[in-house]
Amino acid sequence: MTSIEPTHTGKKVIVGMSGGVDSSVSAYLLMQQGYQVEGLFMKNWEEDDNNEYCAAAEDLKDAQAVCDKLGIKLHTVNFAAEYWDNVFEYFLAEYKAGRTPNPDIMCNKEIKFKAFLEFADEILDADYIAMGHYVRRRDNSDGSTQMLRGVDGNKDQSYFLYTLSHEQVARSLFPVGELEKHEVREIAKEMGLITHDKKDSTGICFIGERKFTEFLGTYLPAQPGNIETPEGEVIGTHQGLMYHTLGQRKGLGIGGMKNSNDDPWYVVDKDLERNVLIVGQGGHHPRLMSTGMTVNQLHWVDRTGPVDGCHIAVKTRYRQQDVPCTLTYTDEHTLGVVFDEPVAAVTPGQSAVFYDGEVCLGGGIIDQLIRG
């Protein structure tokens, strides 16, 4: 492996150590660059079953093993109260209102780059924080800092970080954003880090791998109702609108319908007033397609957003191909977006994130869909 010439001697970085390979390699790379590195493990959820407790304990054990191997300190902190108040209650309120939120985005905003940064500043006297996210930062000659997509297009996580402020980006380092995932695993293996072959975590941010329906049902009462076609024919029942999202195909329990073709059924709409789930056949059903949307709760990383009438790219969900679009401001908090071509399964409550080439500009929450 090519050694990196140390260039940042003395600057202190607190790395969010999750017990995964990305944060492990981030800590190693920053040490190679000459930073004074310490780790911080966050506990953000009070586990309520043995499986979750064991998984969290395993993550902490792995984080400690990596820090021991690298010869750095590992601190721990409990942000469970902040997570509940600022992330989880929002998550439940959105589901209750019939929308589909993205808790990972709120978790990054409120916990990883707010509570974590404040703790690193006030308690650990950090110059920077670092996370194992696949994004990059660019420091421009005019003093501004921009957030760029990660080099690994399949792992790029800028969609989840669009709510970061200019100041938060300027205080954060993202070492693995310059690498492909396979390179990160190779570095971890070469360094003998225990996390080199640990599988990536999935599931809700910090809550972990659970059966989502059961988990949500413990916090929100389910309200069963009918499943109907767009024409109003009742063809089944659902256990609760909150368990379904636009474009969903699996788990509908519909099949073998008389007088219907073999095309799969998709969720194409929700009627909140009647508690009815509306389904149609085919992934490009007209009710599933949108020609545009309104976006509110706008946030721009570099403080000033794109100009009115500009033509840029948007993602309405993670890992989606860029969608070319034109923007029109209704006011400073709301944006009208018209897609160049209709887009399937645009979902209220999810985030719309805008890009100018490699630069993540910011985004907002999808509010209303424009159809036809």
Swiss-Prot record:
The record marks 133, 350 as: Interaction with tRNA. Its EC number is 2.8.1.13. PANTHER family: MITOCHONDRIAL TRNA-SPECIFIC 2-THIOURIDYLASE 1, TRNA 5-METHYLAMINOMETHYL-2-THIOURIDYLATE -METHYLTRANSFERASE. Pfam families: tRNA_Me_trans, tRNA_Me_trans_C, tRNA_Me_trans_M. Belongs to the MnmA/TRMU family. One of its GO terms (molecular function) is tRNA-uridine 2-sulfurtransferase activity. ATP binds at residues 16-23, 42, 132. The gene is mnmA. This is tRNA-specific 2-thiouridylase MnmA. The active site is at 107 (nucleophile), 205 (cysteine persulfide intermediate). Residues 102-104 are annotated as: Interaction with target base in tRNA. Disulfide bonds join 107-205. It is found in: Cytoplasm. It catalyses: S-sulfanyl-L-cysteinyl-[protein] + uridine(34) in tRNA + AH2 + ATP = 2-thiouridine(34) in tRNA + L-cysteinyl-[protein] + A + AMP + diphosphate + H(+). The lineage of its organism: Bacteria, Pseudomonadati, Pseudomonadota, Gammaproteobacteria, Alteromonadales. Catalyzes the 2-thiolation of uridine at the wobble position (U34) of tRNA, leading to the formation of s(2)U34. Residues 155-157, 317-318 are annotated as: Interaction with tRNA. One of its GO terms (biological process) is tRNA wobble position uridine thiolation.
